[in-house]
From Swiss-Prot:
Optimum temperature is 80 degrees Celsius. It is an enzyme of class 6 (ligase). Transmembrane segments: none annotated. Optimum pH is 7.5. The gene is lig. DNA ligase that seals nicks in double-stranded DNA during DNA replication, DNA recombination and DNA repair. Can use both ATP and NAD(+), but NAD(+) may be a preferred nucleotide cofactor. It comes from Thermococcus onnurineus (strain NA1). This is DNA ligase. The lineage of its organism: Archaea, Methanobacteriati, Methanobacteriota, Thermococci, Thermococcales. It catalyses: ATP + (deoxyribonucleotide)n-3'-hydroxyl + 5'-phospho-(deoxyribonucleotide)m = (deoxyribonucleotide)n+m + AMP + diphosphate; NAD(+) + (deoxyribonucleotide)n-3'-hydroxyl + 5'-phospho-(deoxyribonucleotide)m = (deoxyribonucleotide)n+m + AMP + beta-nicotinamide D-nucleotide. Its EC number is 6.5.1.6. NCBIfam families: dnl1.
C-alpha cells in the first residue's frame, strides 16, 4: 500500500489555516490530492475535512478531552493538570498538545516517523475498540501515536480526534479541489457526491476513471443520497401557478426527514444530515421490514412523534429519540413514532431518480403496505386552488406544518433546492439561522456565551449574512450546553465578542422583520427569541437571505391590508 508521511498532511493543515482565500485553499488541497497514492485516496479527503469517517458511517472514535489529555500525558511525561491549565490559557487543546510534545521527557529508541496509513489505522482500532477494557485500549493506541508525533503533528491529530479542525475547508472547496487535481468537471464531481455522499470514493473514481467514470456513478444501497430540497411559496395559489396545470400536494409533517435503505432484512435509516440513526429507532426498522414488500429499496419519509389522540408532537421529540443510545425500550413507550413515506429513489436494482414524481409515487404505493407505524404521506393531486386550500386548512387543523407542492413531472434532484418542490407554511414562521458569533456574559454568566449573532445563508456567495442577535429564550442549562458546543468553534474575536465557525443551526422566533442598515443583509429581526437547536439541519440548509426578503414582503403586504 502506498503511503505518505503524516507531517505532509500536518503541513497542509497549517497552510490552510494561514489563508482565508478559497482559491488558495482549493489549490493547496488539489496539489495534495495529486500526490496522494491511490490506496490513500478514499481516506485523505475525510482527513482533510478533519473527519475520520463519512457522516453516515456508524463508527466513531468515542474519545473525549479527558482521555486525550491522559494519552498525551502518558506519551510525554507532562502532568495532566499542566496540560489542562495550558488548555485554559490557549483555549485550544491542539495547541496545548503541541506544547506538551515540545516538553517530551524522553524519546523512544524505536520511534519512527508517523505515516498517514499508521495514523488512520490507529483511528480505526480506536473506533472498533469495544467492551470491557476498551477505554484502556483506546488510551494505549492514542499514546503510541503521540509518542512518535512531532508537536505540529500532535496538534492536528488531537483536533481530528475531537472533531475540532479549523482549516476552513468545507464540501465546496473539496469538490473544486478534486476537479482541479484530476482535471475533471466540477459538476460531475458534485453529481457523483450527491448520489453517494462519499468524497473518498468520488476522488478515487475521478483520478482513475475521469469524467467517464464520474458520469457512470450511480446510487448504492448503504450510501445515502443527498436530499432534494424545496423552496418556499407564499400561498397555495402561488404554488399551483408555479407548478402549471396540476400538482401533487402533500402534508408537510413537523418531524425529522429520513432516508431508508433496505437490502433484504438489513435496514439502515439515515437522518437529514445523513447520520445513521438505525439503532435508536428499532420499532421503525420492524415497521419497514413488515411494510416494504420489495427486496431492495431506498425510500424517503418524515418521522413524526405521535402524541395524545394521534396529534403530532414537535420535531424535537424525534431528535430526542435519535440521541438516545440506552434504555431505548423505555423511549419507545414515551415517544412513539410514525413514519410517513413520500418518495422512492431505488427499487430492486432500478434507480428511480430520473423517473417523474407521478410514477415514483405510483411505485411507492405499489411496494408499500401501510401499517400502524408506517403510512404513505397524505396526498392530493388537483388543478383546483379551492381543493388545495381546503387540504392546507385540514393539515394545519391536524397540527401539521403546512403543505408540500410537487410538480408531477419532476425528477429527483439530489442536493438541489429548486422550484419543482415548494413548501407552503403560515407567513410569520420561525426561521432556522446559523450562529456566527457570540458574546461572553457578565457577572455570574461571565464564563458563558450569551448573546448570539445569527445569520441567513446566501446560496450565491456561499456566505452567512447576519440578521440579528439572539439573547432571550435560553435557560441556564441551554447556555452551558451552547458554550460547550461553540467553544471549539471559536475562530477569532475581539474583546467580549467571539467569531464562531458557522456550524450550528438554531430555530428563532421574532416579532417582525425590519429593514436595517446595521447588517449588510439589509434586514434585522425585531425581538428575536431562541426556540430550539436544529441538529437535523446543516448550515447550508438554514433559511436563505432570499427567504427573509420574501417574508418581509409578505409582512408588509399583510400590514397594508389591515
Amino acid at each position: 500500500m502506498g503511503d505518505m508521511k503524516y507531517t505532509e498532511l500536518s503541513d497542509l493543515y497549517r497552510r490552510l489555516e494561514k489563508t482565508t482565500l478559497k482559491t488558495l485553499k482549493t489549490k493547496f488541497v488539489a496539489d495534495f490530492l495529486k500526490k496522494t497514492p491511490d490506496e490513500l485516496l478514499e481516506v485523505v479527503p475525510y482527513l482533510i475535512l478533519g473527519k475520520v469517517f463519512p457522516d453516515w458511517d456508524e463508527r466513531e472514535l468515542g474519545v473525549g478531552e479527558k482521555l486525550l489529555i491522559k494519552a498525551v500525558s502518558m506519551a510525554t511525561g507532562v502532568q495532566e493538570r499542566e496540560i489542562e491549565n495550558s488548555v485554559k490559557d490557549t483555549g485550544d487543546l491542539g495547541e496545548s498538545v503541541a506544547l506538551a510534545l515540545k516538553k517530551k521527557k524522553q524519546k523512544s529508541f524505536f520511534s519512527q516517523p508517523l505515516t498517514i496509513k499508521r495514523v488512520y489505522q490507529t483511528f480505526i482500532k480506536i473506533a472498533e475498540a469495544s467492551g470491557e477494557g476498551s477505554q484502556d485500549r483506546k488510551l494505549k493506541y492514542l499514546a503510541n501515536i503521540f509518542m512518535d508525533a512531532q508537536p505540529e503533528e500532535g496538534k492536528y491529530i488531537a483536533r481530528t480526534v475531537l472533531g475540532m479542525m479549523r482549516t476552513g475547508v468545507a464540501e465546496g472547496i473539496l469538490r473544486d479541489a478534486i476537479a482541479e487535481a484530476f482535471k475533471v468537471k466540477a459538476e460531475l464531481v458534485e453529481r457523483a457526491y450527491m448520489l453517494t455522499s462519499d468524497f473518498g470514493y468520488v476522488a478515487k473514481v475521478a483520478k482513475l476513471e475521469g469524467n467517464d467514470g464520474l458520469g457512470k456513478v450511480h446510487i448504492q444501497i448503504g450510501k445515502p443520497i443527498r436530499p432534494m430540497l424545496a423552496q418556499n411559496a407564499a400561498s397555495v395559489k402561488e404554488a399551483l401557478l408555479e407548478m402549471g396545470a396540476e400538482a401533487a400536494f402533500e402534508i408537510k409533517y413537523d418531524g425529522a426527514r429520513v432516508q431508508v435503505h433496505k437490502d433484504g432484512d438489513r435496514v439502515v435509516i439515515y437522518s437529514r444530515r445523513l447520520e445513521n440513526v438505525t439503532r435508536s429507532i428499532p420499532e421503525v426498522v420492524d415497521a419497514i421490514k413488515a411494510s416494504i414488500k420489495s427486496e431492495k429499496a431506498i425510500v424517503e419519509g418524515e418521522l413524526v412523534a405521535v402524541g395524545e389522540g394521534g396529534r403530532p408532537r414537535p420535531f424535537q421529540y424525534v431528535l430526542r429519540r435519535f440521541r438516545r443510545k440506552y434504555n431505548i425500550e423505555e423511549m419507545i413507550e414515551k415517544i412513539p413514532l410514525e413514519l410517513n413515506l413520500f418518495d422512492v429513489l431505488y427499487v430492486d436494482g432500478e434507480p428511480l431518480i430520473d423517473t417523474p414524481f407521478r410514477e415514483r409515487r405510483a411505485k411507492l404505493e405499489e411496494i408499500v403496505e401501510e401499517g400502524e407505524k408506517l403510512k404513505l404521506a397524505q396526498q392530493l393531486v388537483t388543478k383546483k386552488v379551492e381543493e388545495a386550500e381546503e387540504f392546507y386548512k385540514k393539515a394545519l387543523e391536524l397540527g401539521h406544518e403546512g403543505l408540500m407542492a410537487k410538480r408531477l413531472d419532476s425528477v429527483y434532484e439530489p442536493g438541489n433546492r429548486g422550484k419543482k418542490w415548494l413548501k407552503i407554511k403560515p407567513t410569520m414562521e420561525d426561521l432556522d439561522l446559523v450562529i456566527i458569533g457570540a458574546e461572553w456574559g457578565e457577572g455570574r454568566r461571565a464564563h458563558l456565551l450569551g448573546s448570539f449573532l445569527v445569520a441567513a445563508y446566501d446560496p450565491h456567495s456561499g456566505e452567512f449574512v447576519p440578521v440579528g442577535k439572539v439573547g432571550s429564550g435560553f435557560t441556564d442549562e441551554d447556555l452551558v450546553e451552547f458554550t460547550k458546543m461553540l467553544k471549539p468553534l471559536i475562530i477569532g474575536g475581539e474583546g467580549k465578542f467571539v467569531e464562531i465557525e458557522p456550524k450550528v443551526v438554531i430555530q428563532v422566533t421574532y416579532q417582525e422583520i425590519q429593514k436595517s442598515p446595521k447588517y449588510r443583509s439589509g434586514f434585522a429581526l425585531r425581538f428575536p427569541r431562541y426556540v430550539a437547536l436544529r441538529e437535523d439541519k446543516s448550515p447550508e440548509e438554514a433559511d436563505t437571505i432570499e427567504r427573509i426578503a420574501q417574508l418581509y414582503e409578505f409582512q408588509e403586504r399583510f400590514k397594508a391590508k389591515k
